[in-house]
Every structure is written in structure tokens, then in C-alpha cells.
């Protein structure tokens, strides 16, 4: 059953700080520190289905939690303004993803060797859902990672722009 997307313009600052607050509470219970920074001006709006983008953030973060191997876990969320898009960066200091695995992490059911052999293996669909939701929004998602250091997940959403009246 496909849920109808409820897309509307949302204030970037309000929306993402709410998301970060929710995530922060969950991370706190796990002893992981959240660092949140919004570099976007006050009244910028983004076109998004609020529930779906929450799910994107949740899936990325739960992945980061799953592969967190440091005694002091830190997850950073940065919101940046890049032209017609808002870019969200979610960085962790977990175990990282091997270069050979990076291109495939958004494929359905793909799991790295590490996760296949770990007790924490997930279903392998979390990040493919992320990719689908973002593509439905006309956005995209990608990642950079260094083994032993951590991973940065990036995604972009289109800004809402008032069309000036002629």
C-alpha cells in the first residue's frame, strides 16, 4: 500500500532542529553524542514530506548506531545551503565502509561483508528506502567513508522558491 506523499514547503530551521531533537534523545540513551549545526538562513524552505524525510534521517542514524564501534560515539548533523538545494550531512565516527562497498550500500538487500558477519546485521533495506524516498523527492543521496574513521552520508532536497509574478 503506497502512502500518498504529503509534500509541502517546510521551514528548514524548524523542521531539521525538531528532527535533531528527536534523534538526540534516542542517541543520548545509547551514550552517543549528537552535534547539530544549521548553516541555512532563517526563512529558507524546503519541499518535503515531513514524515518521509524523518524516516530518511532515522534510517541513516540507525545504520550509524549499528556500526558504531568507538567507546565515545559522535554523530554530527549539518544542514547547508547549496544553490537550489539544501544539503544534509550526517557524519559518524563508526567503523566506516570499505571503498569497494560504497557504491552498493544503497542497493536493496546489499550488506557489506562486515555486516553479514556481525551479530547486528539488519535487513539490508534501510538505505535503499532512503534512496527511494529521496529520489521521489527529486533529491539524491551519496556517501563518503574511511575505514576505521567513519562515514558521511549526504542528501539534498530541493528548496522551495516562490515564483515571482510577472
Task: Enumerate the language-model features and the residues they cover.
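Acidic ATP/Mg2+-coordinating residue in the GHKL
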Residues: 92
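Short beta-strand/loop element within the Bergerat-fold HATPase_c
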Residues: 74-84
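Conserved catalytic submotifs in the C-terminal HATPase_c
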Residues: 28, 33-44
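A conserved beta-strand-to-alpha-helix junction within the catalytic ATP-binding
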Residues: 8-24
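Conserved glycine-rich
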Residues: 138-139
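Short conserved segment of the HATPase_c
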Residues: 97-111
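Short, small-residue-biased leader/transition segments that mark boundaries at the very start
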Residues: 2-7
Amino acid at each position: 500500500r503506497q502512502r500518498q506523499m504529503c509534500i509541502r514547503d517546510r521551514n528548514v530551521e524548524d523542521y531539521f532542529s525538531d528532527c535533531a531533537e528527536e534523534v538526540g534523545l534516542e542517541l543520548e540513551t545509547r551514550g552517543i553524542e549528537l552535534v547539530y549545526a544549521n548553516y541555512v538562513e532563517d526563512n529558507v524552505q524546503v519541499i518535503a514530506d515531513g514524515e518521509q524525510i524523518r524516516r530518511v534521517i532515522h534510517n541513516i542514524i540507525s545504520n550509524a548506531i549499528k556500526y558504531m564501534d568507538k567507546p565515545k560515539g559522535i554523530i554530527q548533523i549539518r544542514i547547508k545551503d547549496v544553490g537550489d538545494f539544501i544539503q544534509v550531512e550526517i557524519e559518524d565516527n563508526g567503523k566506516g565502509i570499505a571503498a569497494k562497498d560504497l557504491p552498493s550500500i544503497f542497493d536493496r538487500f546489499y550488506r557489506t561483508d562486515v555486516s553479514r558477519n556481525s551479530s547486528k546485521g539488519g535487513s539490508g533495506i534501510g538505505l535503499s528506502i532512503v534512496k527511494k524516498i529521496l529520489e521521489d523527492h527529486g533529491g539524491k543521496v551519496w556517501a563518503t567513508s574511511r575505514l576505521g574513521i567513519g562515514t558521511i552520508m549526504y542528501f539534498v532536497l530541493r528548496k522551495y522558491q516562490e515564483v515571482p509574478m510577472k
